[in-house]
Amino acid sequence: DVKEQYELVHAGGGIVSHAHPFREEDYIPEIRLFPDCVDAVEGINATHESPASTSHKNILYNEKAIAYAKEHGLPITAGSDQHTTRMIGGGMLFDRKLSDEKDFCRAVLAGEAKAYWNGSEFYG
């Protein structure tokens, strides 16, 4: 149950960021969105835009995710989804040094995070 998992993550001090919510692949039978059971949305996934990507390449996945996050007032997270040494590009920036994973969670929820793609496009 999605709600139960969301509550368990929170009970452990974590946050839930919906990874690549609009990716369509044969192993993802349908797009399922849970705006009330996530704390953030992965708006930037490097494999969706990188020239080095050999799968999942579709810029619309990121564009839809960013619009979805904004529509629901959710912070935007980013990641490289790096499965090879050729894949780099997405990440998170903070204006201060984070002390640990709990500080990371607090900073994301407080809107301190900036998601970036390719070192030049920032969201958040």
Predicted regions and their residues:
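Catalytic beta/alpha-barrel core
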Residues: 18-20
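Active-site and NAD+-binding cores of ADP-ribose-processing enzymes
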Residues: 10
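Charged catalytic cores and adjacent phosphate/nucleic-acid-binding surfaces used
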Residues: 3, 7, 15, 24-124
